């Protein structure tokens, strides 16, 4: 299982993330359809972006899945973050309480 705080990069674009909340599902974390790798791992020369998963990722945004896994994008890129073939959802910010 990937640990909290692990930094990963895409093999097909510039996307980089930090794992905020890890679950077993993150073992299949992908970007652009290809598995994400640690920052010190070489990118595969055979990795190609899946056009169906080329929606991009926004810097500074958190992405989550149904299992509770959460990643923070530290460098934006063209690939869509997914677990397997299922795209992650953008985490919505909680509204602040009124300060009357």
PLM features: what roles do these ranges have?
Residues 1-2, 47:
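A cross-kingdom feature marking solvent-exposed beta-strand/loop segments within repeated
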Residues 2-42:
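Acidic (E/D-rich), amphipathic helical modules within compact regulatory domains
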Residues 4, 93-100:
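Short, charged, intrinsically disordered terminal tails
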Residues 36-83, 87-91, 97:
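Short, solvent-exposed interaction modules
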